[in-house]
Amino acid sequence: MSTSSPPAGTHSAAGATGGAPGDAAAGGAPDLEVAVIGAGPHGLSAATHLRRAGVQAHVFGSPMGFWKTMPEGMKLRSNMSATSMVETVGPLSLTTYAQLSGAQIEHPVELSDFIEYGSWVQRTAVPDLDERMVSGLARTSAGFALELDDGARVSARRVVVACGIAPFERIPAGLGLEGLPAERVSHTAHHRDLGAFAGRRVAVLGGGQSAFESAALMRERGAAHVEVLVRKPSVVWLRGHGVKKRIGRLGPIVYAPTDVGPLWYSRLVEKPGLFRQLPREAQDKIAARSIRPACSHFVRVRLGEIAISTGVGLRGAREQDGQLRLSLTDGSEREVDHLMLGTGYKVDVSRYAFLDDGILAELRRADGYPVLQRGLETSVPGLHMVGAPAAWSFGPINRFVSGSWFAGGAVAREIAGRSSGRPVGGVRS
């Protein structure tokens, strides 16, 4: 996998801070020591660890915003320990939240419970959250200039990007899907209420959790017929906690609480510092094995009324007589009302629309991922990226909530170690 610094794209520059109070470009102190962009699990974790380390961190974004767009009724695949953000044990863990709130939470964790938990973490650890969105980010001589969605401009010495995977939807190319209307083709990420497909015939393309769970939820909410089309010859069915129960006391030894990766690999990917020392070929192999498309047992048992076709892919799709006609790679066709793409996400940080051309030109990348160094810092000094974009440099754990334990701490240690107590001007809401 080659690394590169692609030429600048079509992003608009945020510009300078325009003489705002504390304008670093004008020679004064920046408004903020650290700006965290994003208020999901990774953003909240980074901010919490920074504040615990004595570093001022100002967080922008909608609390748990991406999670609030996910399908109602969804459940998290991760085990209880791995569903904690910030830390697996401590005052902000899922267990502590359940004890303090009285919430009855068990595996698999309901999406609604997880959103409530994340909102509690935000209220507890980042009560001063700034819900304005960052629309532009550019370099200045002393750090960064941020443009907000209300037109305000602020400056920051460092920036942590924790914006998740929303812009990274994977849409298969070469199938003619781009010209079809949204009422015919959509991604699983586009739907909060899958009851909207009641009475309709739907084909789902994909072989992982999102494809199968979306199929189950649609059928349970009244879809007339649902079929899942899986390109690979078989489906990877996860066996739940059966294996851990069978191996007894060995379970905690070979399976890390982060719950990422299969037997033995789990303990390796739990240690990003160790993982990144492996040869690139080994990293890629282990990462692919750890995040391969698979379906949880708790979803599998709900698929009794779902048609599943394996070893078949999509060749093309066209509207005909008010329906959508799918041409499949085995020569057969399907006539449906809607095609849903459960095709996951492909990281490409150039799709973060707020990054300006200057940053993109300087940002070293590998297959769409930023190439990160210690403290999850990019090749742009002072710019850090956490969450899924960190997976190429620090392993697959960063794609998951449990990766926030590592990333938040690593960013905080690096920034706190460089902090000299320099003054900042503050920011007005």
Feature annotation, model-predicted:
Residues 2-11, 15-64, 107-209, 213-221, ...:
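Flavin (primarily FAD) cofactor-binding/catalytic cores of flavoenzymes
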Residues 68-101, 255-276:
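Flavin (FAD/FMN) cofactor-binding and adjacent substrate-gating region
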